[in-house]
């Protein structure tokens, strides 16, 4: 049997897709896959920060439309790119094993957040990253930086930036253990990641129950539990890419530990929530963050 898989065409997207498809093939070895590459709004518009594009789901909308139109059977995404409300008719059903969810400080000299020189130029087009950086180091100069991972790394190495903040998961998946530039993980307390970072997710039509069942059987259980908490947080807090909110769940033997935060105007507010039910833990964390947002 052949499954048509819609995905973006970047090198990292294709690597992530193959990672998730390998999990599926481990469950159903006889399945074959056909990759359907789709261009998204986020791929086509490279000269603006994401929050200025003004379109929800800039990296996922067109990919999911391919599934709804019958041009593909399933779609593969970075979970962090999926909005909390999926297009009606689609189901979020599959999760890869999670790569490190942290953001990382990328620089030729291997700077940490503490050792960055005063006034250093740090590249990011993320409101979340920019606001948390300002809260930790108000002396830094934050400049927009977009493009695929290779493009951003090249701009840092060329001296246009002293450092940049990027997802550790993308760097690991793209370069393995030999990145072309040092990357120092940032503690989630310093820079809470976006919900879903490090997890690759699969979307299929709700009516295609055979495929959604297969995706659930192939899913990593730990990643699925953490995703449930983070998706509940995302839906409850209602923040898009224009708000500096982050939230990350960690499954432990005792249950779910959730770290979330909000930053604005050089100040940040962090919360920690613990519990057994992922959805409830995510919602409680969101309510605490929402209270902090109202006070600023």
Curated annotation (Swiss-Prot):
Disulfide bond sites: none
Function: Tetrapolymerization of the monopyrrole PBG into the hydroxymethylbilane pre-uroporphyrinogen in several discrete steps.
Organism: Pyrobaculum neutrophilum (strain DSM 2338 / JCM 9278 / NBRC 100436 / V24Sta) (Thermoproteus neutrophilus)
Lineage, top ranks: Archaea, Thermoproteota, Thermoprotei, Thermoproteales, Thermoproteaceae
Keyword tags: Porphyrin biosynthesis, Transferase
The enzyme's E.C. designation: 2.5.1.61
Protein name, UniProt field: Probable porphobilinogen deaminase
NCBIfam families per the UniProt record, alphabetical: hemC
GO BP, sorted A to Z: protoporphyrinogen IX biosynthetic process
Residues recorded as bearing S-(dipyrrolylmethanemethyl)cysteine in the entry: 241
MF term (GO), any: hydroxymethylbilane synthase activity
Listed cofactors: dipyrromethane
Enzyme class at the top of the EC tree: transferase
Record's GO cellular component terms: cytoplasm
Catalytic activity entry: 4 porphobilinogen + H2O = hydroxymethylbilane + 4 NH4(+)
